[in-house]
Every structure is written in C-alpha cells, then in structure tokens.
Amino acid sequence: MKNIQGIVFDLYGTLYDVHSVVQACEEVYPGQGDAISRLWRQKQLEYTWLRSLMGRYVNFEKATEDALRFTCTHLGLSLDDETHQRLSDAYLHLTPYADTADAVRRLKAAGLPLGIISNGSHCSIEQVVTNSEMNWAFDQLISVEDVQVFKPDSRVYSLAEKRMGFPKENILFVSSNAWDASAASNFGFPVCWINRQNGAFDELDAKPTHVVRNLAEMSNWLVNSLD
C-alpha cells in the first residue's frame, strides 16, 4: 500500500461506537437500552437509504430523531419531547472505540493526512469530534450535506477525493460498515473493512482490499506497509 497518500474514515460505527447510547437509553427505559439502540440504528440507516432513493434528503439529525420516534412507538415506549431531545443528543456524545485515538495518532505520526466522511451534518460531525476531544486528529471533516444525499451514493465518495486532494486510488477508505466498504470499493477507493464482529461481508460485487479486526490492527498493517 505504498501508494496511499491519505486516509478517510467513516465516523459512525468505525471510529465511534454508536451503541454507546445504550447507557442513556437504559437510564430512561430500564431493561430496554440495548433493544432501543439496535433498532434505532437499524431504522436510522434505513431512513437514510430510503430518503436517498426517494430524493427527500433531510440532515442526519432529523433522520436520527425520526428513527428514535419509530423505535419507541414500535417497542411501545412513551416518548415525550424532553426525553426525545435527551436521547437524540446522546448521538453527539458518542464514545470513540478504545483503539481509535492510538490508531489515529500512529497514522498521523506516519505523515498521512486524515479525514472523516460521514452521513452526519457538518455540525454533528464537529460536535462528536469536539465532545470526544479528538479535534487534533483530522485534517478534513467531510459531510454529505454538501451533496444533499446519503451514502452509498457515489457523489458522497467523490467528495472525499475532492477534499483530500488526491486521486481516489491513493486514498484508503476505512469503514466497519460492510455496505459502506462495498460502495467505497465500487467507487474506486482501496478499502479496509474493520470487521469487529467477525461477520460475513455483504454479497455485493465490490469487495474490500484488506480486512482487519480493529483499528489497531489496521494502523499496524498500514504503517508497516509504508516502510
């Protein structure tokens, strides 16, 4: 991978644990935190995909809020406005994975420009990064807001090429979401899939270039390959 000149990371589920909202959900709905988090994330993604197909873009905060309303209705849980806001805000305070900071620090030390490309709005990306004290880490924070469509639309991945300033074949795309990794590969990025759950990759034509178990393994592999 000596031709890699920069790296772009997915945010939700790759650098940050989306299920770190379980605690906030559990505080409001004891015994339901895990079920809420999992269905909430599932519907959040479904709404981004469906809105892209329908040409009805809203920002990620709105998609997340709508997914939470569905989740609570489906699970038979009462959701007042105050609780809705409290839980939605939890998505702005996600916890980085334990290996995120060290992996990013090692890649920066190797001289690689780093970026995030996310379905999140500019505001939400900046808040997640700031709230976790990771402002030092990234050269580019890239939002789908600039093209008004969500991943896996190819226009999103094109943003990374433009903002990072390198040809797509020289930008490593890193994601733990198999559908995202496949779409990025289809666009033309070399792709590293973070397979934390030891799962099967989606049966789509485009496959990742490299598969690892976590960000620590990814940074070790890449830095060693650059030597």
Swiss-Prot record:
Protein name as it appears in the record: (S)-2-haloacid dehalogenase
PANTHER family: HALOACID DEHALOGENASE, TYPE II (AFU_ORTHOLOGUE AFUA_2G07750)-RELATED, HYDROLASE, HALOACID DELAHOGENASE-RELATED
GO MF entry, a single one: (S)-2-haloacid dehalogenase activity
Record: active site: D10 (nucleophile)
Membrane-spanning parts: none
The family this protein is said to belong to: Belongs to the HAD-like hydrolase superfamily. S-2-haloalkanoic acid dehalogenase family.
Technological use: (S)-2-haloacid dehalogenases may be used for the biodegradation of halogenated substances and their derivatives which are widely used as pesticides, herbicides and other industrial products.
EC number(s) on file: 3.8.1.2
NCBIfam families: HAD-SF-IA-v2 (TIGR01493), HAD_type_II (TIGR01428)
Activity vs pH: Optimum pH is between 10 and 11.
Binding of an (S)-2-haloacid, residues: L11, Y12, R41, S118, N119
UniProt site positions, description: Important for catalytic activity: T14, K151, Y157
Pfam families for the chain: Hydrolase (PF00702)
Region (Important for catalytic activity): 175-180
Subunit structure: Homotetramer.
Reactions mediated catalytically: an (S)-2-haloacid + H2O = a (2R)-2-hydroxycarboxylate + a halide anion + H(+); (S)-2-chloropropanoate + H2O = (R)-lactate + chloride + H(+)
Key words of the record: Hydrolase
Gene3D superfamilies: HAD superfamily/HAD-like (3.40.50.1000), Putative phosphatase, domain 2 (1.10.150.240)
Lineage: Bacteria, Pseudomonadati, Pseudomonadota, Gammaproteobacteria, Pseudomonadales
Known role: Catalyzes the hydrolytic dehalogenation of small (S)-2-haloalkanoic acids to yield the corresponding (R)-2-hydroxyalkanoic acids. Active with 2-halogenated carboxylic acids and converts only the S-isomer (or L-isomer) of 2-chloropropionic acid with inversion of configuration to produce R-lactate (or D-isomer).
